[in-house]
């Protein structure tokens, strides 16, 4: 089962996958502590600088600097609503790697417990939130990738030249495929 695989492969003490995120960060920065705090905040739903500042307690200027390093090194990306210009201030930060996203959402804050072999609480928390976690991030990404491929295979009424998502204060659309020449779009939620 997925629960048993998570327990056996991710929650065991001294697991190489447990060390991977910090080892990766250390390749880019000498002191990963604040970067880890920012990645944990993003993984738990803080996607704009203001939310990340509130979650981490770091100064806004420092958060912006750290986010720039994380973005340049490929750990995070800044997504803009597809309907807005690239320099829009409405961008949201997301962790690019699915495993790192999972690690910083579920495992980072439980390192001491896991090192002592205390797995049940972590597993219960993961089970409780896994479906929402997959739906919120992984499933949406798969759907956006499908939109690109389906357009290329002519399985859609047109070929989207841009695929992403869009949002404002009231609503979010998870999948938007837009053809700028034909001024057509497909929406998926």
Regions found by a protein language model. Name each.
Residues 1-104:
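Interdomain hinge/linker elements that couple catalytic modules in large macromolecular machines
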Residues 91-189:
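A cross-kingdom feature that marks ATP-driven nucleic-acid transaction machinery
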